[in-house]
Every structure is written in structure tokens, then in C-alpha cells.
Amino acid sequence: QLGSLELALDQSDVFGSCDIGFSCQYTSTISWRDSYTPLPMETNPRAVFERLFGDTGTTDPAVRLQRIRKDRSLLDSVTERVSELNRTVGAGDRAKLDQYLDAVRDVERRIQMAEAQSNRELPQIEQPAGIPNTYEEHAKLMFDMQVLAYQTDLTRVITFMLGRELSGRTYAEIGVPDSHHPTSHHRDDPALYEKVTKINEFHTSLFAYYLDKLDATPDGNGSLLDNILMLYGAGMSDSNRHQNTGLPLVLLGGAGGAVKGGRHLRYTEGTPISNLHLTMLEKMGIPMESIANSTGRLNLLSGV
């Protein structure tokens, strides 16, 4: 089982400083290991498939088990050679090797889990060829990969970025030959406002496709949507003014009955978004004292 998947639709191809002295890394990923370590986001559905099922090109159990055993054999060879090397190097190099061995053991643990799950009946799906030609096809294929990952319990945590900040992607397929960022600074121009609204509605319609897939996929006594907890939104409440407070966010899924939906909740001005993150973790059985700049939990979130 993978600890998490970080996925996106736009390549990260910008470097340096992007906005008011902040690193472009903040535009390229929305998932971080810690305050200083960004997690790279995968954009190729083929690579996502390989990460989930290996490079066999199929979800067939027999083929997957054969590949798993080959991987285990290679890993055993690597571990043996590193252990021999560890006995001959100095303290500094030994520390580096120990760090490497920790990573190897993590891979070994994943192989063991894969072996245990190799007979599980999986949906018959062939490996994607690569990135589709249109944004819509790309988004839907990446959503399909996410449903498959949850359905097979190969991960329980996914971060997905529909669009990179400052991306130059245009949306000709919906009649908008402009990119999202310049149209979001619409300056109350009706033509630009119409364009950015079209893009936002397009993104939301694709997200609705994902929700329908989750709702149609059985999981336990309900569906994946009943048991998932997902946050959908953006980093600006008014992009025209670069206003990043009072964010309009949507929380979806039932978290196994821990969260009641169908409501519009408004919180006190200045409430950190990390309070929401902290509460979401708690609802999914991961209690923490704090996260980032959190000041507490959102007590109104339950309502069940």
C-alpha cells in the first residue's frame, strides 16, 4: 500500500521566484512532506498505473504476482550487497547507507503487502498509453486512476491538482482561448469574467464526474463516496484582488458517517484553514494536537 499519491494535470516546468519573492514550488505542488520538502506531483496516467500495479501493463493477478516475485529477488540482492558494504565503510558513509536501507525496507514492506494482496480480484483495466490529447480526457483518466487506487486499497490518501498556479494552459475545447490566471484578474471586465466563469464551471463539471464514479463504486455497506472525506477548493476567494481569506471550500464524502453534509457553514473571519485540515484528520481517525498554524478544531463540522 502506498502512503499517498500526489497527482496533477499540469507539468511543473517553472523555477525561481514566481510571486512576491515566493518560490515557484508553491505553484507546482499542493502537497508537502514538511515545511521545506515539496512532494512532486505525477501527471502521466501511465506512470500512475505503473506505480499502483507495476509495469506489467495489466491488473491480471498471475502476471502481477510474477512481477512481484522478480522485484523481491532483486531487492534481496540489493539488501545483501548493501549490508556487506556497510561493514567496510566509515561512520559518515554508514549513516548514509542506513538511510538508504530504511528506504529499501520500506519498499520491501510494500512488496510483502503486494504479495498478500496479489490474489485480490481487481477490475480488468489495461495500462494507459500516456497523457491524452485533451484536458477533459486527461482529467477523467486521472480520476479513474484515483477510483481504482481506492477501490483496490492501494492507497488511502490522494492529493490532486486540477490546475497549476500561473499555468499557461488554454481552454479552446470549451471556447476559451485564454489561460486561467489572466482571466481570473478580470478587472470586472464582463468578457473576462465570462471566460473565467466558464473555466471554473468546466473544472467543477469534471470534479462531478469523479464524484459520480465514487458514488457508483461499492465499498463496505455503502459506496466509496460514503466512506471518503475530500476537500475541493482553491487558494483565492477573490482572484481579481489576490484575496486569500474567506475561502469558499467544499467538503465531500461521509467519512464513514463521521461528517454530515448538505449544509453551508460560515466560520469566524480569520479562522485558519489548518483548523479544517486538523478536523478532517481527526474525523478519519488520525488525532493530532495541531498542524501548521491551527488554533483549534471546527466544532460545527460534525452535526451527526
Which residues fall in each region the model found?
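Ligand-binding pockets and gating/stacking loops
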Residues: 1-304
